[in-house]
Structure formats: C-alpha cells, structure tokens
C-alpha cells in the first residue's frame, strides 16, 4: 500500500535537499534527478531561480510516496515507481525534480523536491487539489498493476475495518454517523481517518508530523 502526501515545511530548499540525500537514509543508486543532476541539484535549482529573477517566495514543493512496512516491495522498485510518477506528472513539466528513496526506517518511502520555478519559461509551479488527487490516483494504479495493496478509506492495511471514530458530544456524533452513510461530508471524520492513515505508515514522531 502506497500513499502520497504533500509535506509542509519551513526549511529552505538547500536544507530540504540536504535532508533527503543524506547517505544514511538512502543509497547513491536510489537518488535520481528529473531535468537535473543529483550531484549539482542545489546549484542548478538556484541558477534557474536567478535566471528568471524569482529567488523569493515559495522555493519548492515537497511530496512523499510512502509504502506500508508490510508491503512486499524492494527499494529499487519503489524508486523506479517514484521516478515514473515524477516523469508523468504534467504540472511538473519543465521543473527540476529530485527523487530520493529512503530505506533507513521501517517502511520504504520516496521524497520529491520540486523546484518552484520552471526552467523553460520562468513560471512558478501551479499545484491544485486536482493535481494532488491525480498523483494519488496514478500511485494507486501503480500498486494495482504490481499486485500491491490499494488504500481503502476506513480500512487498515490488512483490510480490516478501523475502529469507530468517537465523538464527545451528541451533535458531533450524529454528524459523524451521517458522514459514515455518505449523507454529508465531515471534515472531522476526514481528519480522523487521515490521522489513522498516518498511524499505519509512520514509524516515528517526526515521520507522523511530516505526513
């Protein structure tokens, strides 16, 4: 089971690139560059920003493709999947992307650091909820084709129903019951399920916060 998450971070682009390429977290063969070279990626991304005079504001986007610890997948295949996703993400066309697959924790996961400035035309990266959903859908299709588990809302990795969400007042309880039947949309329920998803894949406090 693989999940895609957009990561919000206050770190600068240099710090983010240094973190995802740490030797103890990955191996040289598990780091790839799309429209850039891993060894010179910081200089290349900075050069693109300076070329178009866009060195301020949001400097990058960070995403993670994470596999459940019990999923049967090799680090090499996980990295290949990540590179394939990056190459076929339309919104990233013309953007330098660093892909690094980490193997230092209980589960395999790949980081995507996307330069916010397009090296071809200088436009800033436009990223919508629809783009994120498309990325998730293609991730699920990868898993389906490879015989891996597909995330199901309200279910664990093994396919069991998750524990019922508990509400501390009657109004919230009734709202959640309606949401379970699909009668209304509940952000409380969505948040609870998102937390449960993270509990399934996170192996540390820091990883839980990142997800």
Language model features with spans:
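N-terminal nicking endonuclease/strand-transfer module with a His-rich metal-binding environment
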Residues: 1-211
């Amino acid at each position: 089971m693989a999940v895609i998450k957009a990561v919000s971070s206050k770190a600068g682009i240099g710090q983010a690139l240094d973190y995802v390429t740490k030797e103890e977290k990955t191996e040289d063969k598990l780091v790839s560059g799309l429209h850039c070279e891993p060894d010179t990626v910081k200089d290349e991304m900075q050069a693109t920003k300076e070329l178009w005079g866009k060195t301020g504001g949001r400097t990058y986007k960070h995403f993670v493709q994470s596999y459940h610890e019990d999923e049967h997948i090799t680090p090499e295949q996980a990295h290949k999947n990540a590179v394939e996703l990056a190459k076929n993400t339309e919104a990233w066309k013309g953007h330098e992307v660093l892909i690094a697959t980490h193997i230092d924790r209980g589960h395999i996961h790949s980081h995507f650091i996307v330069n916010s400035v397009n090296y071809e035309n200088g436009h800033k990266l436009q990223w919508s909820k629809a783009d994120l959903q498309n990325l998730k859908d293609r991730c699920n299709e990868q898993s389906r084709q490879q015989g891996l588990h597909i995330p199901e809302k309200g279910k664990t990795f093994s396919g069991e129903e998750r524990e019922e969400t508990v509400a501390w007042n009657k109004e919230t309880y009734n709202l959640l019951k309606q949401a379970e039947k699909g009668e209304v949309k509940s952000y409380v329920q969505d948040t609870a399920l998102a937390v449960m998803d993270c509990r399934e894949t996170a192996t540390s406090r820091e990883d839980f916060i990142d997800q």
